[in-house]
Amino acid sequence: MKQILMAGFITLTLSVNNALAQSRDDWPSPIPNEYFGQVLFDRLEYTRTDDQQNIGVWDMQAWYGGDYHRLVFKSEGENTQNDGMPTDLERAELLYGYLVSSFWSIQFGVGTKGELSSDADMENYAVVSYQGLAPYWFEMENSLRINEDGDMQFINETEYDWQLSQVSYLQPRLEVVANLTDSEKYDRQSGLSNIRIGLRYRHEIVREVAPYVGVYYSKALGNTADALKAEGKSTSETGVVLGARIWF
C-alpha cells in the first residue's frame, strides 16, 4: 500500500512540475519593458578667463529608451562674447547605446563639429564611446572619433562627485584629448594635445537644479603647444566659472 501511495505521489509531483514548466513559457515578464528619457545639462555656465574673455559654455546629453537599448544625443560647445566670431560647436552626436554591464554602456553613431556659420566647413565623423562608472564611482566617457578623411582623435572625460552633504558636492573634472593622426585640414597635430582640469562646488536647490561655482586650468601639450607658440599664441588658460547643472 505504501509503495502504491509513494508511486502515486511521485507521479503526481512529476506531472505538476511538468505542467508548471510548460506553462512558464506563457507567463508574462514580471517587469514589463518600459521606456524612459532624460535631458541633462551637466554644464551650463558662464566663464571668465585670465585674459578677460567672457565665454558661454554648454555640455548636455539626452537619451530615450529602456535599460539595455537607448537613443542618445550629445552636444557641447561655447561662444566667446563680443569677439565677432561664431559659436564653436565642439560636438553634436547622435548615438545608439547598449548596456554591456551593470555600470557600462557602449555607444556608436555619427557626429559633427565646427563653427556655426553659413560658410563654415563642418567636420563630420563616426564615433564610438564607452561610458559608465569606474571603480570608486568615477564617471568616465572614452570616445574615439574618425572623420571622413580618416583622421582619428581620442577624448577622455572623467568626473567624480565628492558628496559633502545631502545637497552639496565638490566635483573634480579631467579632460584629456589626444590626436592619433595629423590633420592639415583641421589644423591638428598628432600626439597628446590638451589637458583640462576643473573643480566645481555644486549645491542643489532641488534635485533637478544645482547652481555651481568653480575654476579650471587648460594646457596645450606636445606638437599642439609647439604650433601655438610658433603662432605667438598662449598655450594655457585659467578661468572661473558660474553655472548650473539642470536635468528633467
Which role does the model predict for each range below?
Residues 201-204, 234-248:
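Outer-membrane beta-barrel "beta-signal"
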Residues 47-55, 78-90, 112-124, 144-155, ...:
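Solvent-exposed loop/turn segments connecting transmembrane beta-strands
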Residues 64-66, 98, 132, 146, ...:
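Residue-level signature of outer-membrane beta-barrel architecture
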Residues 19-82, 98:
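Outer-membrane beta-barrel initiation region
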